[in-house]
Amino acid sequence: MRIWHFSETAYPHLPAEDDYESVRVSMPNRYYDPKIGYELYQNRIDEWCYADELGIDIMINEHHQTPTCVDPSAPIMTGVLARVTKNARLLILGNPIANRRQPVRVAEEMAMIDVMSKGRLECGFVRSVPYEIAPANSNPVRTTERMWEAHDLILKAWTTHDGPFTFEGEFFHHRMVNIWPRPYQQPHPPIWVTALSTGNATDIARKGYKLGTFLGGYEKTPPVFNAYRKAYREAGHGDEVPLENLGYSGLIFVGETEEEGRAGGQQLLWYLSHNKLPMHFKNPPGYASIDANVMALKGAQIGVRREGWVPDLDEEMAKGIVFCGTPDQVFDQLKKFYDHVGGFGNLLSMGQAGHLSHEDTKKSLTFLAKEVYPRLKELGKPTSIAAA
């Protein structure tokens, strides 16, 4: 198993919740202090560099118009890290290509980072979350189709080396595509795609790409992983599904004592609790399928708060959303989850969120790297999983 240190680069200094309608899209940026923002950027970059020193890989994402993720350009942050880190793989999960007007620009940016990092880039694609439809001035309908067409154009741009080509799709039309530079890794960097549903997992598996899923816990993760395994085999990729093709993201804090570990886990709950979002941003018409809307009405939305909901640490640990405690306790929690979902090869560890201090973040990273990671690396040897 590989561990990827992940932070959404949040700005936690928010007004009282009654003072704003939504934490995303419409919160006025007068609440943002650039001087504090500068310090937060320095701390997050230092933590990613420290993860690199500890032998942990790095994950970056991007979101827009929200204090919960003040990283609106994953390529910029990853370009910085390509220069200041030495060994870590650099995963962008991901580029919201359904909302990008110029997929060729994404192909160029990713190729440039891959060269700058000497082939350490892992490139993820996402269709974007619902609330970003409005700030992207994007059509909420057929976003999945737009994402895959943008993917096709990017892949062709990466792998065409004989001069310009023309691309005529349903959503994207480009003439004279001929990117410089081309990727360091040939034919292209490893590709990841996110999935929170079995349908998305099936599409990803058919292409043989890596899948990342977030905060699904014990209940929602097994169906996603099992759908991937089934489709992977049916696509003829082989009977054994590589563990390295599956990734899970949870909130993780490792302390010296159980009390310290739980205190850190409690701090990470900020990410779940500060998520006030009105329905017109949460679920724009046409974005979600009928089945997804039925699940939402049943309370099955992932990562979106119910009004008045205050997360309880023990409940979130029992769900497989938060993993915290001593090194032994965190390993046991992760091992139990690993066995329950049938195994996975990438732990996308959200080890920093909200008011968790820079010092505590680094302390947790140290325990994770030195006392938990060596045991996690032993899981799943040999590196494939049997039939689900």
Regions found by a protein language model. Name each.
Residues 1-88, 189, 386-388:
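N-terminal beta1-alpha1-beta2 module of alpha/beta enzyme domains
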Residues 4-32, 144-180, 220-341, 377-388:
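An alpha-helical appendage that flanks or caps ligand/catalytic pockets
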